[in-house]
Amino acid sequence: MGRSRSRSSSRSKHSKHSRKRSRSKSKSKKRSRSKEPKRNRRSRSRSGSRRDRGGSPPDRTDMFGRTLSKRNNDEKQKREEEDRRVEIERQRKIRQQEIEERLIEEETARRVEELVARRVEEELEKRRDEIEHEVLRRVEEAKRIMEAQLLQELERQRQAELNAQKAREEEEKSKRVELERILEENNRKIADAQAKLAEDQLRIVEEQRKIHEERMKLEQERQKQQKEEQKMILGKGKSRPRLSFSLKATE
């Protein structure tokens, strides 16, 4: 049993090694196959390019093995890099100079400001009494001006109040005159109405008097006529009884 197991294990190991070898061989074959067409393609492209150039002579090379075109490109690139470095350095110097000039200007302005402030302070110290006197004078002048303006304002307010009072009085007077005119007009209208009423009353009394007189006159005529008729009747027949008539007086 132990021998069979060892044999089987050795066989399996041998088969594994053989598989690995076959795989490596196949891979190497594939690589060689894949490399061959690439080389063929390169050789073909080179031959094609040579054919396209029509047998033009190859570029010349310098002592370092570079072609002239590559050397020219390298030199051009170096010059451009050098120009860029020069330009960067120039810009840096310009900025540095601008910074220095600005610092100089700021320092100059600061010193000038300090100098001016110191001179002003010295001048103020020298003219302190004169300045105080001038300040007092201006204060007094301003006080007088303010007092004059205050008096003018008070006078203006007083005058405005007087004008307003006068306007109110004029308005009240005009209102009073208008009221008196209205009262007078009303009194006149009342008097006219009363006079007209009195005239109407007199006319009515006169008309009533005339009506009463007419009635009395008619009554007298009627009585007279009755008397005459009675006389005529009495004259015709004395046997008839005497008629008596009585009339009530109408108002």
From Swiss-Prot:
- Which keywords are on file for this protein? Chromosome, mRNA processing, mRNA splicing, Nucleus, RNA-binding
Name the InterPro entries for this protein.
ARGLU1 (IPR033371)
Q: Region Necessary and sufficient for transcriptional regulation: start and end of each range?
A: 54-251
Q: Which Pfam family, any one, appears in the UniProt record?
A: ARGLU
Query: Does Ribosomal protein appear among the keywords?
Result: no
Per its database record, what is this protein's job?
Dual function regulator of gene expression; regulator of transcription and modulator of alternative splicing. General coactivator of nuclear receptor-induced gene expression.
Q: What is known of its domains?
A: The N-terminal region can bind RNA; preferentially binds 5'-CGG[AG]GG-3' motifs. The non-classical LXXLL motifs are not required for nuclear receptor coactivator activity.
The name this protein carries in UniProt is: Arginine and glutamate-rich protein 1-A
Q: Which organism is it from?
A: Danio rerio (Zebrafish)
| Gene that encodes it | arglu1a
